[in-house]
Amino acid sequence: MTWYVIDGMDGSGKSTAGRFVKDHLESEGRSVLEITHPTEHRVVGRIADRFLHMPGGKFWELLAALFYILDVVASLFYVRRVGKNYDDIIFVRYSMAVAYVPAGLVPLTYRIVESVLPVPDVKILVDIEPEIALERILFRGESLESFETPERLAKVRRKIMMISDGWYIVDNAGSDISLREQLLAVLRSEVMA
């Protein structure tokens, strides 16, 4: 079993990348379980998502982070139970959520997360300029999360890049075709490794 994590800031195209990786692996006859965080089918995931849309700042963001962590841990237990039934597991969003904490805490928080939670086999970071991310977020027509402003997205991106060592970085500023080609190159390099 290979465990893939696809992560990045809001609006980067993580879900699109996750779908592509899943479709590609399934086209090769592999069975794939894909889990996107926060998960809609789990209470803690729905609560985390709800808190992300609350006005009022830091208090709600802290609660969202707490429920996000609970959601991820629940997914890890779920994979432990059913993972043997799949060739591959994909998590869309995982440890890069630490980039949403204050900048001074990001490296330490990331090291703690990496030492406490299981480390995936393949880590893919979907990168994008904050302006393009915001355009895509607005195009979706959903209500904005508290972090989805140009300034906050730029800060989050800087923090993500601080902790991206060991990640495959794909640039999603271009077309879906470009994204697919980059992801396919990552998958090929993993097969050859």
Tell where the protein language model's regions lie, with residue ranges.
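ATP-dependent small-molecule kinase phosphotransfer cores
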Residues: 33-111
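Generic enzyme active-site microenvironment
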Residues: 5-8, 90-91, 127
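Glycine-rich phosphate-binding loop of ATP-dependent small-molecule kinases
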Residues: 1-64, 119-122, 165, 175-193
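NTP-dependent small-molecule kinase module
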Residues: 22, 131-193
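Short, well-ordered beta-strand core segments
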Residues: 89, 123-125, 169
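A glycine- and Lys/Arg-enriched "phosphate-lid" helix/loop adjacent to the NTP-binding pocket
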Residues: 98-101, 105-158
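Anionic group-transfer/hydrolysis microenvironments
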Residues: 9, 94-95, 99-100, 129, ...
